[in-house]
């Protein structure tokens, strides 16, 4: 039996600009994504067995522990692509990243699974191959695997490193509101007026020159869903400098906010920072 523990960081979209809809139903985006110090943890164990099996467990009752979970899909794909057989893989998921929040909680766990299994099997896959598997599983996995600050294009799976400028972060999420990517992109497509601010390019230049990036925070999907949810309007009214991450419903502000006057209907996560790495062994 071999075991490993992997920490899987959440991500923020510092910018998210929708370019167009693709023939495969996904959207091409232009986005800057930043990993932050909010982590899920995976405890992965591998046993020799008469037949191959994958078992999931965890601390959250909000996620499935079966083949519908991206962790399961990642383990299954890893075994298929490596040709490994007759192993029992057990993965315990310690969930700390909010669900359906625009923070890539599922994607980072999937990326962490690929990394952890590859380490347990003596780096059977190259870094390039790991990224290929991550791209097959979803749009945000490569960001979570590579880590730091990244310029993401295509549907989000094509990434290149950018300089990291460290900021404190406060997260605010309506507890009872999750917005699916499908809903957000559909509503964006229905908008007749789609302003173009080219914030991604402007933020890239600011990062390269080590300048403040706060004025360039932007999300097309916030524009798409904001008018439909009073919970989002409440956040923005109290924290005008905050911005939505991904398809929501989490908002973030690049400050250590000491006193936040929100009801118990909101989850507040403080003492978070930008980080320079991605999924990694604990």
Question: Where are the model-predicted features located?
Answer:
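ATP-binding N-lobe of GHMP and related small-molecule kinases
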Residues: 1-101, 118-131, 153, 164, ...
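Residue-level signal for inorganic ion chemistry
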Residues: 14, 42-44, 71, 106, ...
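Short beta-strand scaffold segments in enzyme catalytic cores
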Residues: 16, 40-44, 140-144, 150, ...
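Gly/Ser/Thr-rich beta-alpha loop segments that engage phosphate groups in nucleotides
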Residues: 17, 27, 71, 102-108, ...
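Short, basic/glycine-rich phosphate-binding loops at helix/coil junctions
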Residues: 50-64, 113, 208-218
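Glycine/serine-rich anion-binding loops at beta->alpha junctions
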Residues: 92-121, 139, 241-253
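RNase III-family endoribonuclease catalytic core
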Residues: 112, 118-162
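Conserved, helical-rich catalytic subdomain that frames metal- and/or nucleotide-binding sites
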Residues: 146, 150-241, 254-282
């Amino acid at each position: 039996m071999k075991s490993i523990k992997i920490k899987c960081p959440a991500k923020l979209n510092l910018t998210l600009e929708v370019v167009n809809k693709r023939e495969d139903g996904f959207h091409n985006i232009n986005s800057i994504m930043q990993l932050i110090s909010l982590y899920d943890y995976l405890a992965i164990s591998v046993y020799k067995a008469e037949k191959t099996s994958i078992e999931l467990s965890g601390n959250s009752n909000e996620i499935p522990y079966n083949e519908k979970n991206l962790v399961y899909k990642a383990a299954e794909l890893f075994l298929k692509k490596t040709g490994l057989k007759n192993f029992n893989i057990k993965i315990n998921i310690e969930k700390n990243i909010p669900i359906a929040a625009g923070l890539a909680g599922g994607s980072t766990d999937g990326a962490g699974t690929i990394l952890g299994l590859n380490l347990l099997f003596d780096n059977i896959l190259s870094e390039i191959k790991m990224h290929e598997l991550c791209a097959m599983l979803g749009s945000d996995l490569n960001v979570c695997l590579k880590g730091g600050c990244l310029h993401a294009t295509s549907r989000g799976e094509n990434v290149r490193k950018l300089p990291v400028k460290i900021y404190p972060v406060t997260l605010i999420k309506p507890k009872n509101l999750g917005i699916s990517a499908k809903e957000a992109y559909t509503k964006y497509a229905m908008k007749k007026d789609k302003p173009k601010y080219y914030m991604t390019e402007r933020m890239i230049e600011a990062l390269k020159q080590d300048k403040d990036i706060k004025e360039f925070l932007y999300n097309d999907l916030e524009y798409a869903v904001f008018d439909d949810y009073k919970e989002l309007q409440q956040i923005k009214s109290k924290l005008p400098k905050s911005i939505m991450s991904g398809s929501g419903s989490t908002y973030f502000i690049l400050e250590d906010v000491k006193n936040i006057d929100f009801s118990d209907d909101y989850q507040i996560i403080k003492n978070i920072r930008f980080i320079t790495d991605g999924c990694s062994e604990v």
